[in-house]
Amino acid sequence: MKVNVTVMLKDGVLDPQGEAVRHALGALGFDGVEGVRQGKLIELDVAEGTDRATVEAMCQKLLANTVIESYRIET
């Protein structure tokens, strides 16, 4: 079973990678990009029947730094 976990910096946390991408887009002539937030997508292939609580535990313990990042689980 595939589970996607999207991890993003929380609102208010400085995103230097996103800012660098925004700046580079402007330098390439892509005007109008006012902000970029960069995160990561983690695709898990877990055993059928793995419950959401198990995936939540994975996120809490390893996949996301919950002090500065939020995550979204999609099955």
Role assignments for model-derived ranges:
Residues M1-T75:
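Non-catalytic terminal accessory/regulatory regions of metabolic enzymes
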